[in-house]
């Protein structure tokens, strides 16, 4: 609610990353976000997760003011995937151990310890891994570092949603994967988000994904949301329409080469 964040204030490197940004998400909203370079997409995510505090404004989650809540407290109810598939897991720990840590991170019990993961929990881990259809349920004792990038990102997605988060943040989580693996992880994402009715924000550079996934398309520029497209308007909208509306609202054309290239790729597919 009216969130602002400025880095290096009062210096020649001053950068207003978020400018009075206002966004209300309804429960179950799945909203892809696209935007120009430096639009504030990752800054928005970092403000939500508590990586830093907003200078002004309020961040509310499920009716609770979390604006100045510690990052580790928020992590119990916020799922977050990064572009780098290596960021979400501990490579020297086994698949089972990584899942146990993710499970314990979300618990509110003060008596939850790593050694207290029960056989029933391990059985549940195995069942959840089987849903990925990657054979990881038979490799639970193997270090995560032996997995491919796609397998690690799929595992991270599973870990982030083992206990349904109040919001799931996906920061270009398929961008570093090969096309086939990216499609599989994206398919898993759609399935999990839909089945759990998870409220989700997903940064993407793919304009077609931005219009086809979820129920809402957001476009950012210069630290604010300049477009919020839903309903029938979104269903009828083409990528060219979206780019045209962005130019009108932002007062300039989109300057993200990756996004513009995805438009060409989509038209040739």
How does the language model describe each region?
Residues 6-20, 70:
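A short, flexible loop at the N-terminus of ABC-type nucleotide-binding domains that lies
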Residues 11, 65-79, 87, 111-118, ...:
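ABC ATPase NBD coupling module
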Residues 34-36:
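The feature captures the beta-strand-to-loop junction immediately N-terminal to the Walker
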Residues 49:
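Helix-to-loop junction immediately C-terminal to a conserved catalytic motif
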Residues 57-64, 227-229:
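Conserved ABC transporter NBD signature motif
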Residues 160-161:
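ABC ATPase C-loop
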Residues 204-205:
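H-loop/switch region of ABC-family ATPase nucleotide-binding domains
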Residues 235-269:
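ABC ATPase nucleotide-binding domains
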């Amino acid at each position: 609610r009216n969130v602002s964040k400025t880095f290096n204030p009062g210096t020649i490197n001053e950068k207003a990353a978020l400018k009075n940004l206002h966004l209300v998400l309804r429960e179950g909203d799945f909203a892809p976000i696209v935007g120009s370079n430096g639009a504030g997409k990752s800054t928005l995510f970092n403000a939500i997760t508590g990586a830093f505090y907003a200078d002004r404004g309020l961040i509310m989650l499920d009716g609770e003011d979390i604006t100045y809540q510690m990052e580790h407290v928020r992590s119990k109810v916020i799922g977050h995937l990064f572009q780098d598939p290596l960021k979400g897991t501990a490579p020297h720990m086994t698949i089972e151990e990584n899942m146990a840590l993710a499970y314990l991170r979300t618990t509110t019990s003060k008596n939850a310890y790593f050694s207290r993961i029960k056989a029933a929990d391990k059985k549940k881990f195995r069942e959840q891994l089987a849903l990925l259809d990657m054979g990881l349920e038979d490799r639970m004792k193997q270090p995560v570092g032996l997995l491919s990038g796609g397998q690690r990102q799929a595992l991270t997605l599973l870990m982030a949603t083992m206990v349904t988060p109040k919001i799931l943040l996906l920061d270009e989580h398929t961008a570093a994967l090969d096309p086939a693996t990216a499609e599989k992880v994206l398919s898993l994402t759609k399935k999990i988000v839909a089945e759990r009715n998870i409220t989700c924000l997903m940064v993407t550079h793919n304009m077609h994904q931005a219009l086809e996934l979820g129920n809402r398309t957001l476009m950012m520029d210069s630290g604010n949301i300049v477009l919020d497209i839903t309903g029938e308007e979104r269903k009828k909208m083409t990528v060219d329409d979206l780019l045209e509306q962005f130019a009108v609202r932002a007062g300039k054309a989109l300057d993200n080469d990756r996004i513009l290239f995805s438009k060409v790729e989509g038209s040739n597919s």
